[in-house]
Regions:
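Non-catalytic nucleic-acid substrate-recognition regions in nucleic-acid-modifying enzymes
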Residues: 2-140, 396-397
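Flexible, glycine-/basic-rich loop-and-beta segments that form/coincide
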Residues: 51, 56, 162-167, 171-172, ...
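A short, flexible beta-alpha/helix-coil linker loop
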Residues: 103-106, 163, 315-319
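C-terminal edge-of-domain segments
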Residues: 144-160, 379
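SAM-dependent Rossmann-like transferase core, predominantly class I methyltransferases
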Residues: 155-189
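Conserved S-adenosyl-L-methionine
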Residues: 178-296, 325
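C-terminal catalytic and target-recognition region of SAM-dependent MTase-like enzymes
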Residues: 289-397
């Protein structure tokens, strides 16, 4: 078999997930893996590009850099862009779109940068074939990414298209659902690999539950997506992609159970729809119940000890909740964890630092993550088994 050429790539992610993403890439077989700002750079071949899009749980998109240069102004930017051999990546009939990210005192207007990039590409093709390619913001054949830091410009091709957090299984939603990429990253940070039961007592539309099931069974998160941008590239290898997409040899059995509950019946309905769309119904049980009403025991169930991993993304109080409501809610969370989940481990994310103190448990680990634009604490709590009320029974599910 002919060995494929290798090239540089960049996987974008959320702040705080860089190390998790780097480990994912190493596991996939990537070389020259290096942490960047909200990204990880690496090197690999076309097969790795396809696998990265399909298999990475904590990547938002995979970029392939094609040019890097310095530009002091928009004229210099235009001239450098004209020098790129665009015919290697597109034709004059190719529709394209531009995504520009600018951190620069020189280039303050990202929209004007986008116009200059468009002009440079259009003028390249006018000179070459007397034909201008069309810009299309909806389903373009080629998505071009421009990153400018001060005067350093990097031009990349976006191999993903829609953000990779859009797995394809979310058919229903609730208010402010957590990103699939962030949920998967948090699960991996918590050490989840399907080794125990897992419980999300505020499951919303089921993101933690589904991502946990996919990790437990080692199902690639991208199998539900209908399309990737690289499928429209001139050098797309349909046979290679088909082999990678249809390879389920790394999937595994999952012998434990994933539980989700929520105070809202509507949320449980929405979660059930998403779980069905992801095809993981047999791994997940749902129940409508308030946090403070939950009963859980570490007694043997079906001959197995239940030492659950508990994942919680409670309300942060950003939407009209009073401080008293938040304090009471987080206090109830702490009480339930302490009395119902002794012997288990809980991880909680929240941007409400004051409310987090009301949990009343000392975190054994603390991380900082971004949930959207909100700076959040992501804390681990070891729920040590101590004296418990003998009346506690496993009645939660």
């Amino acid at each position: 078999m002919k060995q494929q050429a290798t090239f540089s790539m960049l996987a974008k992610t959320f702040k705080g997930l860089e190390e998790v993403l780097a480990q994912e890439l190493i596991t996939l077989g990537a070389n020259e893996v290096q942490l960047e700002r909200r990204a990880v750079s690496f090197r690999g071949d076309k097969a790795l590009l396809y696998r990265a899009n399909l298999c990475l749980r904590t990547a938002l998109r995979i970029l392939v850099p094609i040019a890097s240069f310095k530009a002091k102004d928009t004229d210099a930017l235009y001239n450098q862009l004209r020098k790129i051999n665009w015919s290697a990546y597109m034709q004059s009939s190719t529709t394209f779109a531009i995504d520009a990210t600018v951190y620069s005192e020189t280039f303050r207007n990202s929209r004007f940068v986008t116009y200059r990039v468009k002009d440079a590409i259009a003028d390249y093709w006018m000179e070459k074939e007397n034909q201008r390619p069309s810009v299309s913001t909806r389903e373009p054949d080629l998505l071009i990414n421009i990153h400018i830091g001060n005067e350093q410009v990097t031009v990349s091709l976006d191999s993903s298209g829609e953000s990779l957090h859009k797995r394809g299984y979310r058919v229903a939603t609730t208010e402010a659902p957590i990103s699939e990429v962030l949920a998967a990253g948090m699960l991996l940070m918590a050490g989840w690999n399907g080794q125990s039961d897992l419980y999300d007592p505020m499951c919303g539309s089921g993101t933690f539950l589904i991502e946990a099931a996919l990790i437990a069974r080692n199902i690639a998160p991208g199998v539900f997506r209908s399309a990737y941008a690289f499928e429209k590239w001139p050098d797309f290898d349909a046979d290679l992609w088909s082999n990678i997409y249809n390879d389920d040899s790394h999937e595994r059995d999952f012998t434990h159970k994933i539980y989700g509950s929520d105070a809202s019946f509507y949320a449980i309905q929405q979660a059930a729809k998403n779980i069905k769309a992801a095809g993981v119904q047999k791994d997940i049980e749902l129940k409508q119940i308030r946090m403070e009403e939950i009963k859980w025991s570490n007694d043997a169930i079906n001959g197995q000890m239940v030492n659950a991993l508990v994942m919680l993304n409670p309300p942060y109080g950003e939407r009209l909740h009073s401080n008293k409501e938040m304090e009471d809610l987080y206090s109830a969370i702490g009480s339930t964890l302490k009395h119902q989940f002794a012997g288990s481990t809980a991880w909680i994310i929240s941007s409400n630092a004051a409310a987090m103190k009301c949990i009343g448990l000392k975190p054994s680990k603390k991380y900082h993550l971004l949930n959207g634009e909100l700076d959040c604490q992501f804390n681990k709590y070891d729920l040590f088994a101590g004296k418990r009320n003998e009346s506690i029974i496993h009645s939660g599910f």
